[in-house]
A protein has these predicted regions:
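Segments that shape or occlude catalytic/ligand-binding pockets
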Residues: 81
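Extracytoplasmic cell-surface/polysaccharide-interacting catalytic and binding patches
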Residues: 1-78, 86-179
Length: 179
């Protein structure tokens, strides 16, 4: 059973947008957002929040990414309440792709995974001209296939371009190195 996270361990990221190179683009708060494949998940006034430990690592990683690459970290999703996960799983898209709920999972069952505890974050990045950095797929890419050979979001996808491979290599270790 997962441990319940105390409310005071969850903080909204928007408290830090003036002091850190982060931008918030809470995709699932806008059913018309071009990257939102699930429709209405959060209410329009939702705030992107996360566990204080993840928040610290994310902000430090954003500083390193900005200092070393000139990139701004774009935060797409983090704390996802059980009700929101349930709404995602009940969408026709997920119902048509039940394998997304099997290992390796694209989506966790309601209450499972890091999102309901604010311990998972979905990100993208922009360069100093606010241009999107190409990582090969949208931040939440749901392929019909989960294996590396057929899923462009997979870390070992063999057909990714050198630029995408390089961008992923730059972003990948930043959170770990921020600890």
């Amino acid at each position: 059973m997962l441990k319940i996270i105390p409310y005071d361990h969850i903080l909204p990221f928007d408290l830090f947008t003036d002091d850190f190179p982060i931008k918030i683009d809470l995709v699932y708060a806008n059913p018309d957002h071009p990257e939102n494949v699930f429709g209405k998940v959060y209410h329009p006034q939702a705030r992107l929040s996360g566990h204080i430990d993840l928040l610290k690592v994310t902000l430090l990683a954003a500083m390193r990414l900005y200092t070393q690459q000139g990139w701004t970290l774009v935060l797409k999703d983090c704390l996802r309440p059980v009700e929101a996960q349930t709404r995602m799983i009940e969408t026709p898209l997920v119902q048509a792709n039940p394998h997304w709920l099997e290992e390796p999972r694209f989506l966790s069952n309601p209450g499972g995974g890091g999102h309901p505890r604010g311990m998972a974050i979905d990100v993208a990045a922009q360069d100093h001209r606010a241009q999107h950095i190409d990582f090969g797929t949208a931040f939440d890419h749901f392929s019909s296939e989960t294996d590396a050979q057929h899923n462009p979001a997979h870390r070992l996808f063999p057909q990714m371009s050198d630029a995408v491979r390089s961008n992923r290599a730059i972003l990948g270790p930043r959170p770990i190195n921020a600890i």
